[in-house]
UniProtKB/Swiss-Prot annotation:
Protein name, as recorded: Phospholipase A2 inhibitor PIP
Species for this entry: Malayopython reticulatus (Reticulate python)
Stored SUPFAM superfamilies: Snake toxin-like
InterPro entries reported in the protein's UniProt record: CNF-like_PLA2_Inhibitor, LY6_UPA_recep-like, PLipase_A2-inh_b-type, PLipase_A2_inh_N, Snake_toxin-like_sf
Function comment: Inhibits the enzymatic activity of phospholipase A2 (PA2). Binds to the major PLA2 toxin of D.russelli siamensis (Daboiatoxin, AC Q7T2R1, and AC Q7T3T5) at 1-2-fold molar excess of inhibitor to toxin. It exhibits broad spectra in neutralizing the toxicity of various snake venoms and toxins and inhibits the formation of edema in mice. May bind to PLA2 through its proline-rich hydrophobic core region.
Keywords: Disulfide bond, Glycoprotein, Phospholipase A2 inhibitor, Secreted, Signal
Post-translational modification (record): Glycosylated.
Signal peptide annotation: 1-19
Tissue: Expressed by the liver.
């Protein structure tokens, strides 16, 4: 995977908490410091998200604090197995002020392949991405397909296409997505049962 894709993806999934002002920042590591900004409706919640791209034993982590609509807060915890052994993990925490607490990002579980598989994709700046087969592990019994874009002043429109194995489906749906002042739009959120290999008989 290209390093540019890795850096850009670290700042895609964001959230916010109910407040007049929220801290705005993004950076590598577990925390960041920034500036206060008023949060107009519908982006009227403060939030903090940790994004981790993990290829055991190495991981790249970033933090983003911003104002967002409550629909994105429903993403909560997302662990997507996008390539064999490669995970994109996000922890979104919304709160009523700009000091949102972290949700834990424990180490990747050691689990065996469970015989299921999903289409996998990891695309940035495009809604199209070449698919490959991801062999699901452990409790990963669902396939997630996520397409959307995020508008940021530092990077413009970041379009993304992410597919892979997940243990559970995120609560957010397209009917609840909201356009967040045209800054964030989920164009596709599909979650279905993982596939079984075709019988050799």
């Amino acid at each position: 995977m290209k390093s540019l894709q890795t850096i850009c993806l670290l700042f895609i999934f964001i959230a916010r908490g109910t407040s007049d002002k929220c801290e705005i920042c993004h950076g590598f590591g577990d925390d960041c410091d920034g500036y206060q900004e008023e949060c107009p409706s519908p982006e009227d919640r403060c939030g903090k998200i940790l994004i981790d791209i993990a290829l055991a034993p190495v991981s790249f982590r970033a933090t983003h604090k911003n104002c967002f609509s409550s629909s994105i807060c429903k993403l909560g915890r997302v662990d997507i197995h996008v390539w064999d052994g490669v995970y994109i993990r996000g922890r979104t925490n919304c709160c009523d002020n700009d000091q949102c607490e972290d949700q834990p990002l424990p180490g990747l579980p050691l689990s065996l392949q469970n015989g299921l598989y999903c289409p996998g994709a990891f695309g940035i700046f495009t809604e199209d991405s070449t698919e490959h087969e991801v062999k699901c592990r452990g409790t990963e019994t669902m396939c997630l397909d996520l397409v959307g874009y995020r508008q940021e002043s530092y990077a413009g429109n970041i379009t993304y296409n992410i597919k892979g194995c997940v243990s559970s489906c995120p609560l957010v749906t397209l009917s609840e997505r909201g356009h967040e002042g045209r800054k964030n739009d989920l164009k596709k959120v599909e979650c279905r049962e993982a596939l079984k290999p075709a019988s050799s008989d």
